[in-house]
């Protein structure tokens, strides 16, 4: 067990809640203690939903453990059916609830409710949230669509002549990163190709919709973390092919269009010619030359990390210096992507390891989750959020997809805005020693009363000459003092690597017994660490 203040994924029953909350007409009865009801806040506070998730908790307390907790679950399940009248119900236990070893599936079956009841058995201490969402969706699809599967060995019937091809969009859930807007973007894009969307699931689907999944010609896997298992099962049982390309970025979107056009047997030429994104021109224009070569570190779920790395490298001219994921189930995909950029993959769910890696690599931009936003802020590095888990500000009121051509536009703006433009950096360098615009100047709108505290005194050249031998002997355990001319020279170094240069120089000075850092020391340190 590990004590931590942050986790990238919750326990697997939170993943099941994401599926249930995204759907309509489905209710989740969760065998859980009072403390596990915190999960409601994820949806009402962070995602800003206007209603509670469709979850009933048994909320047993310590005093109930000496009684019949099984009867408590049966009562909660019956009351949930009587009150909400769902089309289907899923039952399971939270991580804490699983310790008392009741059987929610068997108990619910004993009630003989007149609706489908799907037992979700989630290994709470071996798996996490995304796996729980994928397993829940898979079990629902299998239980509800399974009875309509054709006999084994039968061939899929041909689509009637004149009927438009159709597909299912699989994977979007509640609490997903921009899932709501991605659905709209892909539905519009597929409509331009002459392809109808049969069912979007889990988000927005009812149990009755899940029974119709087999009617589509193929499936679009929007988010492999939650949909790949269900898509593979539909492929085996209904002979429905599914897409492999996630349309995040201009190049990936064009490849996605060609992929679905082949599956649907339609001509994509007109759509490829008519659709365009501003990203390619912006990233090639003179105004965007300051993007080229920016060092970027990427961390998040595997789908968004792999897509972001490709966009950063191929479409925006960034240099990927590190990437990783907290999704151990997709470690293979991350390792393969890391080989393309000649970097070491970071596969961990410990945010402290991620912070240490960012500090080590000194990137100029961090792309990650809400935690990477905090890490980058502490380290003074620009950051943009590309993946769940996210906080409330990343569920915007505006339309802001990540997929498709419009998604590429949104991503370009999101990534570029935290960066300092070339002209801006040039002007800061030009006026760095100006009496009004220097680094330590108080912003004019704050007035004189808000002047910052004076900086620590810096040794001048005279002080360097009068240092005695006694002072020199103590420098091994104290931080070296910066001479005024060295401090001035340091300010000429670009801001995004200035901190690293300062730390390396001070380390060099302390290791070599230099009491006062001069310009010569600064360049000696540079030569030393460049080897």
UniProtKB/Swiss-Prot annotation:
Binds 1 [4Fe-4S] cluster per heterodimer. The cluster is bound at the heterodimer interface by residues from both subunits. It is an enzyme of class 1 (oxidoreductase). Its EC number is 1.3.7.7. [4Fe-4S] cluster binds at residue 36. Its cofactor is [4Fe-4S] cluster. The active site is at residue 287. GO terms for molecular function: 4 iron, 4 sulfur cluster binding; ATP binding; metal ion binding; oxidoreductase activity, acting on iron-sulfur proteins as donors; oxidoreductase activity, acting on the CH-CH group of donors, iron-sulfur protein as acceptor. SUPFAM superfamilies: Helical backbone' metal receptor. The keyword Nucleotide-binding applies. Pfam families: Oxidored_nitro, PCP_red. Protochlorophyllide reductase is composed of three subunits; BchL, BchN and BchB. Forms a heterotetramer of two BchB and two BchN subunits. Belongs to the ChlB/BchB/BchZ family. Component of the dark-operative protochlorophyllide reductase (DPOR) that uses Mg-ATP and reduced ferredoxin to reduce ring D of protochlorophyllide (Pchlide) to form chlorophyllide a (Chlide). This reaction is light-independent. The NB-protein (BchN-BchB) is the catalytic component of the complex. This is Light-independent protochlorophyllide reductase subunit B. The gene is bchB.
């Amino acid at each position: 067990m590990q004590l931590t203040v942050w986790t990238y994924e919750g326990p697997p029953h939170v993943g099941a809640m994401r599926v249930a909350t995204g759907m309509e007409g489905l209710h989740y009865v969760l065998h859980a203690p009072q403390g596990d009801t915190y999960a409601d806040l994820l949806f009402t506070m962070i995602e800003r939903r206007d209603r509670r998730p469709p979850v009933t908790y048994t909320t047993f307390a310590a005093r109930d453990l000496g009684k019949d907790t099984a009867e408590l679950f049966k009562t909660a399940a019956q009351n949930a059916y009587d009150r909400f009248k769902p089309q289907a119900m899923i039952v399971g236990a939270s991580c804490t609830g699983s310790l008392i070893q009741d059987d929610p599936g068997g108990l619910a079956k004993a009630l003989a409710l007149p609706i489908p009841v799907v037992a979700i058995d989630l290994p709470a201490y071996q798996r996490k949230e995304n796996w729980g969402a994928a397993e829940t969706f898979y079990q629902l699809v299998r239980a509800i669509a399974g009875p309509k599967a054709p006999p084994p060995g039968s061939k899929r019937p041909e689509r009637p002549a004149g009927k438009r091809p159709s597909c299912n969009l699989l994977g979007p859930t509640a609490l997903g990163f921009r899932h709501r807007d991605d659905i709209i973007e892909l539905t519009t894009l597929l409509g331009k190709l002459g392809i109808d969307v049969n069912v979007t699931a889990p988000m927005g689907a009812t149990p009755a919709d899940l029974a119709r999944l087999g009617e589509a010609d193929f499936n679009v896997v929007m988010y492999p973390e939650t949909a790949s298992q269900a898509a593979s099962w539909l492929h085996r049982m209904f002979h429905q092919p599914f897409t492999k390309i996630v349309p995040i970025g201009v190049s990936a979107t064009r490849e996605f269009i060609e992929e679905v056009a082949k599956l649907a047997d339609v001509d994509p030429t007109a759509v490829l010619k008519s659709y365009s994104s501003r990203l390619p021109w912006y990233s090639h224009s003179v105004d965007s030359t300051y993007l080229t070569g920016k060092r970027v570190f990427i961390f998040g779920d595997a789908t968004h990390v792999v897509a972001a790395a490709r966009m950063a490298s191929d479409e925006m001219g960034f240099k990927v210096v590190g990437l990783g994921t907290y999704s151990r189930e997709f470690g293979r995909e991350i390792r393969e992507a890391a080989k393309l950029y000649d970097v070491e993959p970071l596969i961990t769910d410990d945010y402290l390891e991620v912070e240490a890696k960012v500090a080590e690599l000194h990137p100029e931009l961090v792309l990650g989750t809400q935690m990477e936003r905090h890490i980058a802020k502490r380290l003074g590095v620009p950051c943009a959020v590309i993946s769940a888990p996210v906080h409330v500000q990343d569920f915007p009121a505006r339309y802001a997809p990540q997929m498709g051509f419009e998604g590429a536009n949104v991503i370009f703006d999101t990534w570029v805005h935290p960066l300092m433009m070339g002209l801006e950096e040039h002007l800061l360098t030009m006026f760095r020693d100006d009496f009004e615009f220097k680094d330590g100047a108080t912003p004019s709108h704050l007035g004189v009363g808000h002047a910052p505290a004076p900086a620590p005194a810096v040794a001048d050249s005279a002080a360097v000459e009068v240092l005695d031998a006694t002072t020199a002997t103590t420098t091994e355990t104290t931080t070296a003092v910066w001479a005024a001319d060295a401090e001035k020279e340091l300010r000429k170094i670009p801001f995004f690597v200035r901190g690293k240069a300062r730390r390396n120089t001070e380390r060099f000075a302390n290791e070599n017994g230099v009491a006062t850092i001069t310009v010569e020391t600064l360049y000696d340190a540079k030569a030393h660490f460049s080897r």
